[in-house]
Regions:
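Short, charged/polar low-complexity linear motifs in solvent-exposed/disordered segments
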Residues: 62, 162-165, 205, 235
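Radical SAM enzyme core and accessory elements
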Residues: 155, 181-242
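Radical SAM enzyme [4Fe-4S]-AdoMet core and its adjacent flexible, acidic
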Residues: 2, 6-133, 137-141, 160
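Short glycine/proline- and charge-enriched loop/turn segments
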Residues: 13-17, 163-167, 211
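Short, flexible helix/strand-to-coil boundary loops that buttress conserved ligand/catalytic motifs
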Residues: 12, 148, 199
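C-terminal accessory region of radical SAM enzymes
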Residues: 94-123, 149-196
Length: 242
């Protein structure tokens, strides 16, 4: 979902060549969820939020509650912020180093809890494949990239051939690692084992480089953890993030 009914339908436009335009995509999905929740033991729903639709999350929760009824305990809402990419000029995305993003996550988590919905988040960095010698992305032309999000971006191009992938990956990591910068910037940071200096793809989006900058999220992590402790753990009595 991309918001409440109005926003979601503006962003998820029905293909007029395939579907009747009189149909409401948002309501159709809600009806499907009602049916699916009566069949399956667990359903995961993703809610993409930005600086506009975050304020309509409670309306979405009310609609979802009305749709699934007594089966709401089967629903898990995955909260994920919309971020910048090199392919768009969208101005309402969140900078993932910003404290505002941390506070918005907490607000959405609180709303989920109050409505009785389970949730998970995409706040913390996932393990990165960019400097891994055991992972790569293969495109439809047989080119090898170091990052799953980097399709067509030459800075992440490992090789134009699938021959001798191992040596190509070794050479790429040796040439493109930012270990010397991380050693200086992250030496005393308790989050280093979690983020390992941040995401190379996000560095590219923000700075145009994959090795000369650090997309540091320390202040965002500090804010999220302290806000979670005060607003969720203490006030709501919830001890963990699913």
């Amino acid at each position: 979902f991309d918001g409440n009914e109005y926003i979601n339908n503006k962003r998820r436009i029905i293909n007029e060549k395939v579907h009747d335009q009189s149909k409401n995509a948002y309501i159709s999905i809600m009806k499907n969820l009602k049916m699916l929740s009566s069949i399956f033991e667990q359903l995961s729903i993703k809610y993409n939020f930005d600086q506009v639709n975050k304020d309509y999350y409670t309306f979405f929760l009310e609609d979802l509650e009305n749709a699934v009824g007594i089966n709401k305990d089967k629903i898990i809402i995955a909260l994920e912020s919309i971020q910048d990419t090199p392919c768009n000029d969208y101005e309402y995305y969140f900078d993932n180093t910003d404290k505002l993003l941390s506070k918005t996550y907490i607000d959405l988590i609180k709303s989920s809890i109050k409505k009785g919905f389970r949730y998970n988040t995409k706040f913390f960095n996932t393990p990165c494949m960019h400097l891994s010698k055991n992972s790569f992305m293969l495109d439809t032309n047989g080119k090898i990239y170091s990052c799953i999000s980097s399709f067509g971006i030459n800075d992440f191009l490992v090789s134009s051939s699938t021959e001798d992938i191992v040596s190509s990956l070794d050479s790429f990591v040796e040439k493109n690692n930012n270990f010397s910068i991380l050693e200086k910037h992250c030496e005393d940071c308790c989050y280093f084992p979690l983020c390992f200096g941040g995401c190379a793809y996000e560095n590219y989006n923000k700075y145009g480089t994959i090795r000369d900058k650090v997309n540091c999220r320390k202040h965002a992590y500090d804010t999220f953890i302290s806000e979670f402790y005060e607003e969720i753990f203490i006030k709501e009595g919830i001890e963990y993030i699913e």
